[in-house]
Each structure stands twice: as structure tokens, then as C-alpha cells.
Amino acid sequence: MKTKRFDAALILILLAAAFLNTYHIWQDDTANQYYLAAVKSMTQSFHNFFYASFDPSGFVTVDKPPVVLWIQTIFALIFGVHTWSVIIPQALAGVGSVFLLYRMVKPTFGVGAARIAALVMALTPIAVAVSRTNNIDSMLVFTLLLGSTCLLRAVKQGKLVWLLTAFALIGLAFNMKMMQAFMVLPAFVLFYLIASRVSLKKKIGSLLLSLVLLTGLSLSWAIAVDSASSSSRPYVGSSQTNSVLELAFGYNGTERLFGQTTGLAKGDMNAAGGGNMQNQDNMQAPNGNGSSFSQNGNQSFGNHSQAPQPPNGQTGALNGGGGTPPTGGNGPGNGGPGGGGGKSVNMFGTGDPGPLRLFQSALSGQISWMLPFSLIGLLGAIISWYRDRRGHAAKMKETLFWAAWLVPVAGFFSIAGFFHQYYLIMLAPPIAALSGIGWYTMHRLYKNNKDWSSYLLPAAVLITAVFQVYILSAYTSQIGSVWMYVLGLLGLGITLALLMLKRSHPFSKLLTIISLCVLLLTPVYWSATPLLYGGNSVLPESGPQLKGSANGGNMFSSEVDSGLLSYLRKHNTGEEYLFATLTTVTAAPYIIYENESVMAMGGFNGTDPILTVSELKKLIKEGKVKYFLLSENNSGNSELVSWIKKNGKEITSDEYSGSSSSTNSVQGMRRGPGGESQQTLYLVE
């Protein structure tokens, strides 16, 4: 009986992926507080768990569906609410994606192509950066790859159950990140139509049934929430009508393409007109002794570091990574997990819309290192199929699946008006797969042909190396120019070797492997930068701009003011909420670290129309809340803010600042979408 042997190279690749995704996360005290607060709240009741409530009292939800947060909450219930316990699921998903890609490529293209695909996936910088956070996208990609695996099996085995499972997994993915999950639908439908061996009538019938299942699963949670009485559930965060369906197809749908048009506040983001934002680089991050809380007895968060000053006195508008932006110019602006935006499409450091957007310095370092190689490899696959259609039919169909994933997604990000850099992880699987497939096809053309097609491999190596040098040229202020010149010389040298030793078969395969190693040198370093320098938990990114950034200079997080906390606890007379504030940024640390219920009256960035003045009056009259912590530069929910200031008694910071040392680096200051601003406490009875 023939036994299956483990692929030692795959084991090493998986270990490398696990190392990049997990190393030091147990010592990392930073996480996306928006989601971490939700997980903490979701551990406290099934009501909060089902609705993905941001706060313990179930006032407002986060702006994403709950499936990934459900997984994180289960881990938190088992291991306690730590940063590492909510990051581990995404780290494991990142490793799982590498394995699934290997398993998908190997049967058709061989072990060599599968190894390369897995390695490129493991070394994709943005994939590593996202997998080291509690953001949702790594789990989303894993789920879509799992669905892709089922789709391939459906075609090969001809069984409807695998097709239904594949589309059901897209429906599950919709309940992770909404419309982003549907980006792979064209690839799924096209591949089944061209690759399945059943009749056209049966193909259409099977696809229609699968799409019905997909639709039902996708909308199941949204319909369940929207059908519930608004008084019996939390408000749907970042929606304007308290509807999950509106959130899915508006804020998390069309606005991602055309630019954010809802939930904007002039004082917070100054975004609608693309105006200037407050510089965040000179803002100090919290550096107190950290706050502890008990979930299963001994959970704690460690010390928080100080955000860096930009080198050479340079500044960057809302530089999410801290440190110096590429080329020493103005850093990209960033938005939070649920907000920020406007129609200024360059606000989030995503470059200028256009067909070459993925090749611009703003995005290329995150995802595009192997993009030229994969595109030229796709050309090689098409040439091989054209010359031998019968022999390469199956290979071409699978190649088209990855191309149909790559092209629409790349096209979307080339023109989209509202997204963050870490969304580009959606491009990691097709680029990695086409890199492996491209190596397979171009090496065969290189070895077996004497015409122009045999030069595709040397051309791919040279063009990709030149492009990587171009990417590096934007970072000379961080890493110098030596790396750029060394890579250029190595790329030129290996290209010349491929040309001169083309007919020396004993060396040809070794040369192609060496050429790939050269092309992966810089992605290895880029992928390691979150480990080396600390990443940004809210807006993950990789690159040397993180150097010296101390936990990413995370602007969308804040700390507990222990003096304020002591004062509010002392004067609480049974109110359900310790205090109310406008944004989740201010509320989150009190929920996470202190087990307190804090009301975020305006959702993530303070602009959600959750309460009217009369509804707020009712809450105050019922004794549910009486203290309000407001920021001076908040213009969201202006009616509420004006009413509170007019009818409330201002509590000066002198009354609570001396009662206990504050863990904030700046007394009474607020950080977040509106930058740094003075906060004032009001009492309304």
C-alpha cells in the first residue's frame, strides 16, 4: 500500500508562515480596540454575542457582521480576553490559507508550482500584517479559499454537494465582511461554467440553486436583525437607518467604490471636501502602567509605548504607521475600522485611482512585489494552452479561475474611492497562485522551446526585479539605497545567467529557483517589519515606515483616565452607564480594561443618528446615564452636543484630575478620528 509522504518544503513554508503571523503577539498589548471592546461585551451575554454589540449594555453594534467576532469571542471565553487570544484565530487563518493554496495548485501543476504559490502567499506583506491583528480580513480570505477548494472538488468529482458548500462558504464570508466576500463570485461562476463536465442545462440549474443558497445564507443574519424590534436590540453601527441591509449595501457596499458619503463630521474628519487634517505624528500614545481587568481571573494588558516623532522633522497627515512615510513626504491619511472617509480618495494612503494604482508606491509595497511575475506567467499559460489546447485544457481552466479572481478585484481597487491598504489581502491568493503557475509554465517554455516564448521567464525575472527596485526607491530615507542597488544587480545577474545557460539543462531548474529566491528577498523583509518594528492594529501595513513607530502609533485607540474613572465611580448612583461619550474611541478602553458600560452616542466616529434629544432626555430621566464626556472638536450629532452643553453642569478637570494619576499621556485629551482635542465632563440630571 502506497503511503503519502509529508512535503518537507511545505512544512518549512507553513512554519515560516506561523512564525511571521504569531511571533511576539503574546507580548503585544495593542489590538483594534473597536473590535476588542465588542468581544469583551459579547462574552457577557448571548444578546450581545448574537448582535455583535460594541458595549456591554447593547446600545450599538460594530459596523461588521458577527461571524469572525463570534470566533474571537469563543477564543476569549476559553483563554480569556487578551490581545493574543483574539489575534490567534486570524494568525491561524493566515497559515491555513497558505496550506489551502498549496493543496489547490499541486494536483494540476505539480509540487514545485504549489510550493512557490504557498511561499509567495506566506511572504505577502499585507497578508502577514493583517494576520497579526484582530481585524477580519485574514479569516475572510481563508473562508473564500476554503470555498475555492470545494469548488475545485465539485468540478473534479461532479457532485452538487461540493458546489453548494462552495457557495455556502461565500455566504458565510458575507457575514464576516459583507460585500467584500462577493468579489470572488465572478471567478466561481465562470470556472464552474467552463470546467464542469455536466450539461449546460445542469450547470445553470446547479448554479441557480447555489446562488439561492448563497443569498439565503448571506442575508440570514441581516434579516434576523432588521426584523427584530429596534427597542429590543442594539442600533446598527455606522448605518443611517438602523438597518443591517443598508449597512451592507451602502456603507460596506457602494460607498467603498464611489467614496464615503454617510457618517461624515466636519469637525472630526474634515473629509468631505478633502480638507486638511490634524497632524497625528506629534501626538503621544498612552504610556501609563497599563490597566488590568479580570475575565477568567488573571488577564492584563502590558505597558503602552510612546508613539514616535517623525524623523528629520517631517510630518505625515494621519500616518497610521507612525514613523516616516515613503520618500519622506506627507504620509498617507488613514481612517478607522468603521469610519473616516469622504470623497478624497487619497485620504487613506491608497494612491490615485487609475489602471496603474497597484503599481504606485502607496500600495505596491503591500501587495504588488510579485504582480509583474504573475501577470507574465499568466501570459505564458495562455501561450502554452494556445499551442496545445488538448494537453493544457485543464490547466488553463484553473489558471482562468485565478485570473478571474485577480482581474475584477484588482480593477475594483484601482478605481475604488473608500478602502484601506489592508483590504488588498484579497489579491494575495490569485497573485500567489499565478506566481506558482507562471513559474511552472514559463520554466517549461524556457526549457523546451527555442522561439521567443522561451525568453518569457528571463523577461519576467528582469521586469519584476526592476519593478521591485522602483518600489524600494520610495523608501531610501528609511533603508538607504544599498538594498536597491544590490537587488538590481542580482536581478540583472540572474537574468543574464538564465539567458547564457539556457540550454544547460542541469542548471536551468536551479537557476529558476535562484531567480525566485532573489525576487522574494525584499518581500521577506517587508513581511517581517511588523515583527521587527511593531504593527498598526487598526490599519495594518508592512514596510520600513513602521521603523521606530512603537506599536504603530495607533491613533484610533485611547486609554483610561484613572482620575476620571475614580470620580465617576464614586459619584455613580446606580446609573447603567458610567458615562456617555460621542465616539467608540473614547468608550472602548473603559469597556476593555475596566468592565464598565459606556455609551457611544454616535457610534464609531460620532455621527450615527442613534439618539434624538427627546430620547436622550428619557434615558436621563430613567436614571440610565447622567455624565457625558465630550470633545471640543466633535461636530457630529450637534443637536445632542448642544443640548448637553446647554443643560449640563460642566465638571472641571480639577475636580477629578487629582484623585488618581491618569494613564493618559495628556490629561483630559481625546484621540481618534478628530485628532487630539480637549475633553470636558458634563453632569445632566
Curated annotation (Swiss-Prot):
Membrane-topology annotation of the record: Multi-pass membrane protein
Polar residues bias spans: 277-286, 676-685
Database matches in InterPro entries: LipidA_mod_glycosyltrf_83, RgtA/B/C-like, YkcA/B-like_C
Enzyme Commission number: 2.4.1.-
GO cellular component, as recorded: plasma membrane
Places the protein is found: Cell membrane
Ranges annotated as biased composition (Low complexity): 287-303, 654-665
UniProt entry tagged with the keyword Glycosyltransferase: yes
Biased composition (Gly residues): 318-343
Pfam families: PMT_2, YkcB_C
MF annotations from Gene Ontology: pentosyltransferase activity
Alphabetical GO biological process terms: lipopolysaccharide biosynthetic process; response to iron(III) ion
Transmembrane segments: 6-26, 68-88, 109-129, 154-174, 176-196, 204-224, 363-383, 399-419, 422-442, 455-475, 479-499, 513-533, 573-593
Keyword Cell membrane included in the entry's annotation: yes
Key words of the record: Cell membrane, Glycosyltransferase, Membrane, Transferase, Transmembrane, Transmembrane helix
Positions of the UniProt region annotated as Disordered: 269-347, 652-685
Family: Belongs to the glycosyltransferase 39 family.
Identification of the protein by name: Putative mannosyltransferase YycA
Organism: Bacillus subtilis (strain 168)
